[in-house]
Each structure stands twice: as C-alpha cells, then as structure tokens.
Amino acid sequence: MLKFVILLSAVACALGGTVPEGLLPQLDGRIVGGSATTISSFPWQISLQRSGSHSCGGSIYSSNVIVTAAHCLQSVSASVLQIRAGSSYWSSGGVTFSVSSFKNHEGYNANTMVNDIAIIKINGALTFSSTIKAIGLASSNPANGAAASVSGWGTLSYGSSSIPSQLQYVNVNIVSQSQCASSTYGYGSQIRSTMICAAASGKDACQGDSGGPLVSGGVLVGVVSWGYGCAYSNYPGVYADVAALRSWVISNA
C-alpha cells in the first residue's frame, strides 16, 4: 500500500490547482527524480511486507518497535505482516521478523489523514549494526526550507505498478505547516496540525513509500502520508508530523 496521490489530477488542474475539500486521495507511490542508495546511508529504513510482498516503508524506533503510517495498516492482520531490515533490497538480504502486533493512532481519520501514524511491534529484537540503527524522534519541527531526505522503494514513474529492487532516496526541503496551508500551495485547510510538508524543485512532489521516513538534522521529522498530483510544484508531499505526534509514539512503544 503505497503513498496516497490523486489520480484525478485533471480535475484539480481544471480548477486552477485548487483541490476540492473532501476529494479523497487514491493509492499510488513513487520516488521520482531520486537516486539508488544503500541501507548503510539510511539504516533506520525497513520494508513492511504483506504476505512477502513490499507494502510500505517504516523507521526503526527501537530494537522491537517500528514507526509507520496508520493507513498502511488498514484491513490487515498482524499474521500476514513482516519487516525486512538491514538490506538495500526489499526482497533479499538483511533480516526479517514477523509482526506480533500493531497499533494505529486512535485519532487517525482516513478521510482527512490526520494522525496518520502507527507503531509495529516485532517478534524478537533487532541487533543494531552499521545497516540497522534506530532513529530519534524530532521534538520540534525544522525550519521552513531546511534540507531533508526521503527514502523508500516507491515506484519510479507515475502509474507504474513495478517497484525498484534497490532502495531509492530524494533530497527535499521542508515546507512548514503554515506555509503548506497558505495560498502559496493548493492544499489550504486540508493541511492539519498533525501534518508537515516537503518538496523539491524539479522532483516529484509525492516522493516515497507510505510510512517511510522524512529525515532532517539526523532525526525523524515526518512519516510519508499523502499528496496530490497535477501541478507538482503547487502540491508538496504531505507527512505525518513526528514532533506533533511524538508523545503518542513514546507512550505506545
């Protein structure tokens, strides 16, 4: 289940880039304009898999807890889930662990995408190394324009159904919540208090796997959540705001 993106982009374009309130995102996911990388550069990254197939990204919080997006865990049971850590490839290498349980944020709303965060507990414990590391949670948001990176195994082009075997990443810049909701961009009131945005000129506005990490300053600042297609420069990628949701993660981990 990859990142949310509007498929009806022609509708938004016809409306001059304004997205109608309540228009629901559709499923798609990609890292466009990025580059292949290795897990040692993003050792907190994991592949969340359903029945052995890559489904979403996630970030290592502790030896047995993963942070991901709540929308990745809709209509699924823990028994069909596993994670792969420590590998640049979602289908091989590293280590795999089955999932013992997961919990979505109680305030998650699939219509508005508020509180789009979840934790996963695995059976067993990860052994930390150069390719498997936990990442800290942001306690405050980076400044508007701050450098950040997004990683994952998202598809490489719009509408593609295939995903790359090797981990990809893109460099982006933070767009603050207030800026993302301003008239500079097309989201308006759809940007809520539990969201933060990021974008980069010349790169797709909707990078990354759902649930995957947005990292700035060496800490996890966002969880890949959703975004609209059409005029990409006018629609940054939208992420769950880790600083705003930090206390929930800590109390439930």
From Swiss-Prot:
Main location: secreted
Gene giving rise to this polypeptide: deltaTry
Origin organism lineage: Eukaryota, Metazoa, Ecdysozoa, Arthropoda, Hexapoda
Pfam families: Trypsin
Disulfide links within the chain: C56-C72, C180-C197, C206-C230
UniProt GO MF annotations: serine-type endopeptidase activity
One cellular-component annotation, GO: cytosol
Protein name as catalogued: Trypsin delta
Catalytic activity: Preferential cleavage: Arg-|-Xaa, Lys-|-Xaa
